[in-house]
């Protein structure tokens, strides 16, 4: 299987997101890379599912709460930005204060 660099990055984000989802489901508090991976992978999947940038910006701030992550993590992630492929092209999704 031959993947471009971008495809490899997407695959790594998806894998890290799946691991973070499993840890969250087991009741573990997520660290910074896990929290970013979970939100980023959900944003990419939402774009693939046909959601709009606006919908994803709003939803992205609801997936994790302060109770889901280790102490100090919300302050470490003031914003998440990811380029996602939508049916009409690639767009930048920005989620401000993603962990509330």
From Swiss-Prot:
Q: Which domain of life is it from?
A: Bacteria
Look up the record and name the pathway of this protein: Nitrogen metabolism; urea degradation; CO(2) and NH(3) from urea (urease route): step 1/1
Q: Which InterPro entries does this entry report, sorted A to Z? A: Urease_gamma, Urease_gamma/gamma-beta_su, Urease_gamma_sf, Urease_subunit
Where does the record place it? Answer: Cytoplasm
Q: What keywords sit in the KW lines?
A: Cytoplasm, Hydrolase
Annotated Gene Ontology cellular components are: cytoplasm
Q: Which reaction does it catalyse?
A: urea + 2 H2O + H(+) = hydrogencarbonate + 2 NH4(+)
What GO molecular functions are on record for this protein? nickel cation binding; urease activity
Instruction: Give the family per the record.
Output: Belongs to the urease gamma subunit family.
Cited NCBIfam families: PRK13241.1, urease_gam
Protein name from the UniProt record: Urease subunit gamma
């Amino acid at each position: 299987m031959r993947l471009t660099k971008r495809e490899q990055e997407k695959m790594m984000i998806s894998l890290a997101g799946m691991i973070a989802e499993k840890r969250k489901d087991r009741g573990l508090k997520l660290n910074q890379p896990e929290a970013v991976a979970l939100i980023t992978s959900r944003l990419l999947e939402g774009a693939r599912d046909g959601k709009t940038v606006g919908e994803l910006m709003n939803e992205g701030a609801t997936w994790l709460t302060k109770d889901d992550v280790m102490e100090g993590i919300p302050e470490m992630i003031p914003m998440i930005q990811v380029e996602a492929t939508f049916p009409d092209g690639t767009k930048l999704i920005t989620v401000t204060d993603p962990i509330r």
